[in-house]
């Protein structure tokens, strides 16, 4: 029997600004990554997401980013290693308080946007992210691409690393994601569903047609995608057709 974790980035609304359909996607995924107030999210949204994690029994992850509401955390900002570590600790502490109030725990950390991409290629950023998780709680896992600096450094430190693939993003031949400002960056509809199935089976096709080996533990559907709920529904259905079951990576598997 084969299993795959399906995760969604949620909690990215704040104030009167609404992003995504958080509760609607919860029955369709096994893990969530909650924005922690720096790139998106606020204290009311974070509290609600922790409540939903408890109600739906999904893995609760922190989704910290650069302090960049204006750019939605998708702009790389030069910070020192100490600053990056501390900004992550700040965000982890905030989400942890809401999680504790709901009787749940943070199971993983997935950096957001530019911080995620920087940690893949920049040693200093990867070290800062890994250190933040290590000093906060070394039992918490890190979610990242199945290669790159963060994967290597976190693994060397003995942290649990969850290898991630993306249903709705294009891939470069080297396994990195196509930058959002380039052609082929996004996958939609049936193309995204097909890519999710391929990832669950251990491979993905790059924008140039190259077939890449991709052993992943979890597949992401971006919650801010307007078709996220429909996409997650279709992915669930097609995975079942392949006898692949959606289940949180933390749970014991037969």
From Swiss-Prot:
One of its GO terms (molecular function) is ATP binding. Its EC number is 3.5.2.9. It comes from the Bacteria. The keyword Transcription does not apply. It is an enzyme of class 3 (hydrolase). Gene3D superfamilies: Glycoside hydrolase/deacetylase. One of its GO terms (biological process) is carbohydrate metabolic process. Pfam families: LamB_YcsF. InterPro entries: Glyco_hydro/deAcase_b/a-brl, LamB/YcsF/PxpA-like. It catalyses: 5-oxo-L-proline + ATP + 2 H2O = L-glutamate + ADP + phosphate + H(+). Keywords: ATP-binding, Hydrolase, Nucleotide-binding. HAMAP family: PxpA (MF_00691). Belongs to the LamB/PxpA family. NCBIfam families: PRK05406.1-3, PRK05406.1-5. Catalyzes the cleavage of 5-oxoproline to form L-glutamate coupled to the hydrolysis of ATP to ADP and inorganic phosphate. Forms a complex composed of PxpA, PxpB and PxpC. This is 5-oxoprolinase subunit A. It comes from Carboxydothermus hydrogenoformans (strain ATCC BAA-161 / DSM 6008 / Z-2901). The gene is pxpA.
């Amino acid at each position: 029997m084969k299993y795959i974790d399906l995760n969604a980035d949620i909690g990215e609304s704040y104030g009167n600004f609404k992003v995504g359909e958080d509760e609607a996607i919860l029955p369709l995924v096994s893990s969530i990554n909650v924005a922690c107030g720096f790139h998106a999210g606020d204290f009311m949204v974070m509290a609600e997401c922790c409540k939903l994690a408890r109600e739906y029994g999904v893995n609760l992850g922190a989704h910290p980013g650069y302090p960049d509401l204006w750019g939605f955390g998708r702009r790389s900002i030069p910070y020192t290693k100490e600053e990056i570590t501390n900004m992550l600790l700040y965000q982890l502490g905030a989400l942890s308080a809401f999680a504790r109030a709901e009787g749940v725990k943070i199971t993983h950390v997935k950096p957001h946007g530019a911080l995620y991409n920087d940690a893949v290629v920049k040693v200093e950023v990867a070290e800062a992210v890994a250190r933040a998780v290590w000093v906060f709680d070394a039992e918490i896992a890190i979610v990242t691409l199945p290669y790159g600096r963060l994967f290597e450094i976190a693994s060397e430190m003995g942290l649990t690393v969850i290898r991630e693939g993306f249903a709705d993003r294009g891939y470069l031949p080297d396994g990195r994601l196509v930058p959002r400002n380039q052609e082929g960056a996004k996958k939609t509809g049936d193309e995204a569903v097909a890519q999710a199935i391929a990832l669950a089976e251990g491979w993905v096709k790059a924008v140039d047609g190259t077939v890449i080996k991709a052993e992943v533990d979890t597949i992401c559907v971006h919650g801010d995608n307007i078709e996220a709920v429909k996409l997650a529904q279709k992915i669930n259905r097609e995975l079942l057709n392949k006898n692949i079951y959606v289940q949180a990576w933390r749970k014991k598997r037969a």
